[in-house]
Amino acid sequence: MESFRQIKNNNVDLISNNDPLDKNRLLIEDLWESVLREECPDDQAERLIQLKELSYSKQIDGNSSKTFKNEIVDIVNSMDLAESIAAARAFSLYFQLVNILEQRVEEDRYIQSFTNKDVQKSPDNLDPFAPALARQNAPVTFRELFYRLRKLNVPPGKLEELLQEMDIRLVFTAHPTEIVRHTIRHKQTRVANLLKKIQIEQFLTKDEKISLKTQLKEEVRLWWRTDELHQFKPSVLDEVDYSLHYFQQVLFNAMPQLRGRITEALTENYPDVQLPPESFCNFGSWVGSDRDGNPSVTPDITWRTACYQRQLMLDRYIVATSNLRDQLSVSMQWSQVSSSLLESLETDRVKFPEIYEARATRYRSEPYRLKLSYILEKLRLTQERNNLLADSGWKFDFEGEIDNKNIDKVENLYYKSVNEFTYDLELIKNSLISTDLTCDSVNNLLTQVHIFGFSLASLDIRQESTRHSDAIQELTNYLDLSVQYDQMSEEEKIKWLIDELNTKRPLIPSDVNWTKTTEETFSVFKMVKRLQQEFGSRICHSYVISMSHSASDLLEVLLLAKEMGLLDQDSQKSKLLVVPLFETVEDLQRAPEVMEKLFKLDFYKSLLPKVGESFKPLQELMLGYSDSNKDSGFVSSNWEIHRAQIALQNLSSRNNILLRLFHGRGGSVGRGGGPAYQAILAQPSGTLKGRIKITEQGEVLASKYSLPELALYNLETVTTAVIQNSLVNSRLDATPEWNQLMSRLAETSRSHYRKLVHENPDLLNFFQEVTPIEEISKLQISSRPARRKKGAKDLSSLRAIPWVFGWTQSRFLLPSWFGVGTALSAELNSDPQQIELLRVLHQRWPFFRMLISKVEMTLSKVDLEVARYYVDTLGSKENKDSFDNIFEVISKEYNLTKSLILEITGKNKLLESDRDLKSSVSLRNKTIIPLGFLQVSLLRRLRDQTRQPPISEFLIDKDESRRAYSRSELLRGALLTINGIAAGMRNTG
C-alpha cells in the first residue's frame, strides 16, 4: 500500500517540496499518526492509518473506484461502534488540522503580498486589471488596486468621492454546523500559533524545533482527549458567544490595521486623496436578533444580546485605556498640554473626587494619565449600568431600581453615549498634536470607537412577513372593520395602511389580551424602542422582512413601528429602516414592481433616511440566494438576482434614491457562497457605487476570521472588490446578446432542476432516505429548527441550509450544479457555434466567469461512487427502482455538466489552472471518503433499530453481539461524522 510520502515522491502534481503548504502537510501527517499511535490501541491506530493511506492511493479523477470502495467498506463494516466513533473523531481531527494549516499558509501568502513593494506592472497598452482577471483566485491588495487605478487615469476626485461615500457592512449570522466549543476553538488557536513558530524554522535552533514540535503534539493529544461536542442543545446566547469570539480575539485589533493599509496605499499612489471615514467598513449581526422561524429568539434574548455586545466592547475599551495610561507618561515638566484638556481635568475633579484623591498625588504632573484615570472610571460605571440593564430586562423600570440600589451616581457619571467617550479621546489626541506629538495607540483606539462604538455591531431584526399581516389581521378583527384586512385587495391594503400611518390616534388598544404570537410581534417593536432609548439608534435600526411579496408587507411593519413610537409623524422620520428580503425567483422578478409602488408614495419616501453629502434618501434591499436556489436552481437563482439588481438600481436612480443592496449569501455555492472578491466583481456595473451589505455565515467565520492576517485579507479583499467594481467595471458590461443567452440558460436550467426537485414525486423520499437530513434535524447543533413549520415534512417547509447540508454530506452537492449541463447542452444543440460565444463570456464577463468557476469547483467535490453507496445502503427496498432512476438522472447530468464546463474553460481536468485549490480539493476528496462510509454505517444501524424499536433504550448491535449500546451513542457517532465531513468539505449548508 502506498503511503503519503510515496505518493509525494511519485506524483509531482500532488505535492511539491518548494510549496509551503505541501511541505507542512507532511508535518501534519506525522503529527496525526503520532497522536493516534499514542492515544489509540495499536491495532486501532494502524487500522485508521491504513484507512487514510487507502484513501490516498485508490482514487481516480475525483471519483473513488469501485474496488477501492469495497476495500474501505470492508474495513468500516468490521468496526464496532467504539471503533467507528474513534475513526470519526480521528478523521475529523485530521481535517481540522489541515484547515488550520491551510489558513496559516494563506495568512503567510497575504503577508508576503502586502509587504511586497513591487506591484505587478502592466504594459501601458493593456488593461491593468487583466492579470487579476486571468487569475481567478488572486484578489488585489490596496497597493495593487490604487496603482492600477492610477494607470487607468482614474481622477483623484472621482476616487475620493467614492471613498467618502463608501459603506461596507458585514453581517455575522449563526449557522448550525459551526457551534464549536470554546475549549476546542482555543486549542485550534494554540495549534495555529505553534505552527506559525515552526514555519520560521530557518531562525530556530535544533532544540527549539524539537521543543515546538513536542508542544504541538501535546496540544493535539489534549485536544484528542477533549469532548468536542456539546452535551446540550446550544442556546441563542451560546451562538452569540460563538460569533462574538471573532470580534474579541481578532477584529477589534484588525480594523486599525486595515485603515493603516489603505492609508499607506493611498499615500503611495494618490497622496492628495482624503482618507475614507474610519467606519467605511463596519459590522452587523443577526445572532440573537434573527427571529425568522426561530422561536428561541425572544425580545428578552435580543435585549440581552445587546447588553452582551456592549459588555464585550467596554471590556476591550477598559483594557485599551489602561494600556494607554501606562504609555502616556508625558510630564508637564517637559511638555505643554492643551488648555482644553486642563479644563476637562477640572470638570472631572469635581465629578470624581474619589479618583482625584486616589490619583492626584501620583499623577500630579502627568495630565494624560490623570485624564485616562477619569475615563476608566466612566467606563466602569457604564459597565456597571450595563450589567444592571442585562439583569433587569427590557421591560424594567430602571429609574426605580437605580434609586433602590442607591447607585444614582451611575445615572449622572456613566457615558450616556459613545460620543462622550470619543470626545474625551479626541481631547487627548488634539492635545498631543498641539505639542507635536502623536500616539498610534490613541489613533487606533479612536478608529475602534468609530467602527464599533459601544454596540460592537448593529442588530438587524428579521421576521417573516406573515407574522405582521397575521397580527394586523387579529387587530382588525378586534376593531371589527367593515372589510376585514385579509379580504382587502393589495391596493385596498395600501390605502388603509397609508391612512392609518397618517393618523395620529393610536390604533392598537392597550388593554386587550392578544394571542401569544401577536403579543410577541408587538413586543419586538416595543423592545426595539427601548433598545434605541438606552443604546442609541445604532444598535438596532434595520428591520428585515423575509419572504417579502408586496408593498403592503413593508407598510405593515411601518404601521406597527408607528404604533410603538418608532415613527415620528410630525417630522416624518422613522427610527426603523424597513428592508424587504426578496427570496424566491418570482419575488425577485416582482421586486421592481413592488418598490415602484412604494417610491410613488410621498409618505414612504419621506421616511427613508437621508445620507451622505447629497442628503439623498437611502433604500436598503435584501436579495436572497438560498431560497431562490432551492426553488429554481443555481443558474436561474444567480441570473434573476443579477437582473433584479439592475432593474432596482435603475428604478432607484429614476426616483433619486440611493440603493444599498444586501446580499444574503451563504457559505456554500448552493446558497450564494464562494470567493467574495469574484462575487463582488460579478455584480452588475453601477449597482454598488461603494455601498454593499453582505451576510457572513457562521460556517465560514472560522476560515475567514480565526487568524489576524486572514481577517485582514478578507476585509481588504471585500473593500478592493467594491472599489474596483464601482470605478472600472462599467467596461465589462454585458451586451444584449449575452443577456439573451443567459436568460435562455437560466430558463432551461430552471426547468430541468424543477422537473427533478419539485415535480418528481419520489425526490423528497430520496432526499430523506439517502442523506442524513432527518438525523441532522434531531442533533443538538443549533438553536434554530431545521424546518419552518413544526412537524412538516414537505420540501417547502425545509430550510435552505439543511437542504444544501444534506446533499453535501452525501457528496451529491446537487443544488450547486444540477441543470447547468442541460442548459449548456440545449444551447449548443441549437447552434454548435455558440461554444465560441460561451468561451468569450467566460473570458470577458465577470458574472459568467464567476458562475462557471463556482460550478467547476463544486463538481470537483462531487463523488458519485460515494453517493451511490448512500443510495444503495440507505434507500429502502420498496423505493429501489425509483431511487435508481433518480440517481441515473443525477449521474447523467453530472457527466454532461462536467464535460461542457471543461469544453468552455479549455481544460482537460477540473481545477487544473488553480494548483493550490486542486491540491487542497484532491487531498480532501481522498481522505474524506472513509468518513462517508462510516456515516452510512452508523445511519444504517440507527435506522434499522428505529424501524424495529427495542424494549429498552439500549440496542444490540447485530455486528457486535457482545455488548449493548444506546441510541444516543449512535447519534453521537453520526454527529461526529457530520462534523468531520463538514470540516473536510470546508463548506456545508
Curated annotation (Swiss-Prot):
Physiological role: Forms oxaloacetate, a four-carbon dicarboxylic acid source for the tricarboxylic acid cycle.
UniProt keyword annotation of Nucleus present: no
HAMAP family xrefs: PEPcase_type1
UniProt keyword terms in alphabetical order: Carbon dioxide fixation, Lyase, Magnesium
Signal peptide: none
Name of the protein this chain belongs to: Phosphoenolpyruvate carboxylase
Similarity field: Belongs to the PEPCase type 1 family.
NCBIfam families: PRK00009.1
Presence of the UniProt keyword Lyase in the record: yes
One GO-annotated biological process of the protein: tricarboxylic acid cycle
One GO MF term attached to the UniProt entry: phosphoenolpyruvate carboxylase activity
Record field: catalytic activity: oxaloacetate + phosphate = phosphoenolpyruvate + hydrogencarbonate
Enzyme Commission identifier(s): 4.1.1.31
Name of the gene this protein is made from: ppc
One Gene Ontology cellular component annotation held by this UniProt entry: cytosol
Gene3D superfamilies: Phosphoenolpyruvate/pyruvate domain
Top-level EC class as recorded in UniProt: lyase
Cofactor(s), by name: Mg(2+)
Active site as annotated: H175, K630
